[in-house]
A protein has these predicted regions:
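C-terminal motif of bacterial Sec signal peptides marking the signal peptidase cleavage site
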Residues: 5-8
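Sec-dependent N-terminal signal peptides
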Residues: 1-2
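Alpha/propeptide regions of enzymes that mature by internal proteolysis
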Residues: 12-339
Length: 339
C-alpha cells in the first residue's frame, strides 16, 4: 500500500489521464488547524483513515459488493476513539452515548438506518441489518437495538463508549451553560466532537464512506455519535436518507458531515444528486454548490461524493476535514487541512 499523499484534491491531471477512485471516506469536518494538531495525533489520523480505506478496498478487490466495502471502512472508524462514531462517540447532556447511522445501495435505492441506539458496537452494521432483513428503512432506540441484536449485531455495555476526552468535553460545555456563558446552540472553543481541533465548529463530527465496486454499483454510508451535549432525543442528519446519506447509481454516492440541522433543511445529499441529474453538474461542482448553499444558510461542514465513473467530490467550508480516497490500483490519498 502506498504512503500518504498530502496533495490537493484539485491537483492537475495530465490531459487524457483519468484516475478512477473506488472509495472515498471522511472522518468529520471542523476547525482542524495544523497549529493545534500534534504530530503524533496527525499521524494517528492518517493511519486510521488509511486503515479504513484499505479495509474497504480489500472488499472491492475480492469482488464483494460496494455495500460491504462501505460497511468495512466505517467499522474501522467506528472502532477507533479518534472519530465521533462508535467507540469515540460524544456524550449527550445527561452523560449517555446515543448513536446514529445509515447506509444506502445505489443499484436498488434500498436503504437502512438506526437512530438513538446506545448499546450497539457498530451502528452501521445495524443500519445494514435494517436494510437487508426488514421491510423498514429506519428504526430507533430500544426497538432498533432489539432488532439489531436479534440479527447478529454486536452489543456492548455503555462503558464501552467512555473516553476521557469526550467526557471532559461534555463537562466543559455543561459548566459553561451553568455559568451562563454558553447556550445549547453556542460553540464552545474548548469542546470538540472532532479530536485534534480547536476554535469554532466543534460540536459535531461524523464518519462516512462511499464505494464503487467491480460491478459498477455505488453504496454510501454515514455513522455518528451526534453533537456534544445534545438534548431531548436530538437526531441529526447522519441517519436521514437524503440528508446525511444518499446513493443512486445514476448520479453518485454521498455522505455528509457537519451541523446536521442545516443538512436536514438542505436535504444535502439528495440535493447533490439532484444537481447532477437535473442540472447536469459534475460531482465536484455539485458538491461545491451544496456546501455553498449550506454556508449561505449559516451552516458549516463538508460532503464527499463518488460517481459511477470514479470521479470524486470533496468539499467543505471549515478549515479542515479528515478525508481520503483510494483508486482502483490501491493508491491511497489522505487529506486533513484545507489545501
Amino acid at each position: 500500500m502506498s504512503g500518504f499523499l498530502l496533495a490537493s484534491c484539485d491537483a492537475p491531471v495530465s490531459e487524457g489521464q483519468h484516475t478512477k477512485y473506488v472509495m472515498v471516506i471522511h472522518g468529520g469536518a471542523g476547525t482542524i488547524n495544523k497549529e493545534s494538531m500534534t504530530p503524533e495525533k496527525e499521524q494517528a489520523y492518517k493511519e486510521a483513515l488509511t486503515e479504513a480505506l484499505q479495509a474497504g478496498y480489500d472488499q472491492i478487490k475480492e469482488g464483494r459488493a460496494s455495500l460491504d466495502a462501505v460497511q468495512s471502512a466505517i467499522n474501522v472508524m467506528e472502532n477507533s476513539p479518534l472519530f465521533n462514531a462508535g467507540k469515540g462517540a460524544v456524550f449527550t447532556h445527561d452523560g449517555k452515548n446515543e448513536l446514529d447511522a445509515s447506509i444506502m445501495d445505489g443499484a436498488t435505492l434500498k436503504a437502512g438506518a438506526v437512530a438513538g441506539v446506545t448499546n450497539l458496537k457498530n451502528p452501521i452494521n445495524a443500519a445494514r441489518a435494517v436494510m437487508d432483513k426488514s421491510e423498514h428503512v429506519m428504526m430507533v432506540g430500544r426497538g432498533a437495538e432489539i432488532f439489531a441484536a436479534a440479527n447478529g449485531c454486536d452489543t456492548v455495555p455503555p462503558s464501552y463508549f467512555f473516553t476521557q476526552e469526550r467526557w471532559d468535553q461534555l463537562q466543559r460545555m455543561i459548566s459553561q451553560e451553568e455559568t451562563g456563558h454558553a447556550a445549547f446552540n453556542d460553540i464552545d472553543p474548548k469542546s470538540s466532537s472532532i479530536s485534534g481541533v480547536s476554535g469554532k465548529d466543534k460540536k459535531f463530527g461524523t464518519v462516512g464512506a462511499v464505494a464503487l465496486d467491480k460491478s459498477g454499483n455505488l453504496a454510501a454510508g454515514t455513522s455518528t455519535g451526534g453533537m456534544t451535549n445534545k438534548k431531548y432525543g436530538r437526531v441529526g442528519d447522519a441517519p436521514i436518507i437524503g440528508a446525511g446519506t444518499y446513493c443512486n447509481n445514476a448520479t453518485a454516492g454521498i455522505s455528509s458531515t457537519g451541523w446536521g440541522e442545516f443538512y436536514i433543511r438542505e436535504v444535502a445529499a439528495n440535493r447533490l444528486s439532484s444537481l447532477m441529474e437535473l442540472k447536469g453538474l459534475s460531482v465536484d461542482d455539485a458538491a461545491r454548490r451544496v456546501i455553498d448553499e449550506i454556508g449561505k444558510m449559516g451552516g458549516n461542514g463538508g460532503i464527499i461524493a463518488l460517481d459511477k465513473a470514479g470521479n470524486v467530490g470533496m468539499e467543505f467550508n471549515t478549515p479542515g476535514m479528515y478525508r481520503g480516497m483510494i483508486d482502483e490500483n490501491g493508491k491511497v490519498s489522505i487529506f486533513i487541512y484545507k489545501e
